[in-house]
Amino acid sequence: MALNSINTNSGALIALQNLNTTSSELNNVQQRISTGKKIGSAKDNGAIWATAKNQSATANSINAVKDSLQRGQSTIDVALAAGDTITDLLGKMKEKALAASDTSLSTASFNALKADFDSLRDQVTKAATNAKFNGVSIADGTTTKLSFLANSDGSAFTVTAKTLTLGGLGLTTTSSFTTAAAAKTMIGTIDTALQTATNKLASLGTSSTGLDTHLTFVGKLQDSLDAGVGNLMDADLAKESARLQSLQTKQQLGVQALSIANSSSSAILSLFR
């Protein structure tokens, strides 16, 4: 190949190729800086892009898991609140039964205590029946267990229902007394109901703690997945900024090199003047 040719300027061609390469790299860096992503699409790195997309899908699906677990929390919280009310009512029922067991009471006083007892009993039914969250209850005896999403694979966190109705506590809608002796017997019955209620509430409390712990774990898992996706996809902006400055300088030098290479043709022409 001729060293000096007006038909083919090899120096200019090489300079142009280098400038095009630099410009392409510069465009890529500018895109990474503007988007904040080092992997913008499958064409950038198919394997990493696919992995990141799968991880991102898993992280996003955990939102449904968290929603389900939070419903579980609320359902248990409502049952625990109802249970707290019910144990208070049972305590008051015991108080009325104990007072009514006093054989020295007048008939009017006894009847007043019985009426109070019956009213408190009926309030237990109302508290248990209304212990619903979003129409669902684990305290009214309508279900034996409830399952909530535990992970993105569809596995379940199961909570065993605890019936806090009169029947679930060993009482009936007609539990009462008509004599002082019957009132004395009722004291023991209420004590048993109280023990049953507190045992069931303790069990629900354990379930609530377990659900809270799992919800915390799921939240941390989602954060870890999001961080992993970020590590795979996000650009190092400090590094890209330094790279941008370097390529901009390289581009300017490339333009100068191309200008110098193009001037060689003019130099050859001057030889013939």
Swiss-Prot record:
Main location: secreted
Similarity field: Belongs to the bacterial flagellin family.
InterPro entries according to UniProt: Flagellin (IPR001492), Flagellin_C (IPR046358), Flagellin_N (IPR001029)
One MF term in the entry's GO annotations: structural molecule activity
Keywords linked to the UniProt accession: Bacterial flagellum, Secreted
Cleavable signal peptide: none
One GO location term (cellular component): bacterial-type flagellum
Name of this protein: Flagellin FljO
Native species: Caulobacter vibrioides (strain ATCC 19089 / CIP 103742 / CB 15)
